[in-house]
Amino acid sequence: MNMCLLGTIATGVETLRATVKYNMKRGASEFCSEWTLADTGNNGFVWLGNITDMGGMGAFLSTDEEMKWDKDNGCVYKAYTMSKMSE
């Protein structure tokens, strides 16, 4: 995993989980080979993904459709890149 999104979602983490699954079917799987989503309580979440094309991921997250979805669902997050420390 090389990307982490840490945030909150007003409509609940299961809403986000359903949307991630939908997005993977509509093309996000082209640049995200695997992902996991953890519910941290109080509508908080940690999403981890293995991104094979950071430019593609950035472009996907910044589309008008995605930004509207975030606003409509009260989804606020910070994105972090990560690297594996050792084998």
PLM regions: where:
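Short S/T/G/P-rich N-terminal loop/turn motif that feeds into the first structured element of a domain
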Residues: 1-69, 75-87
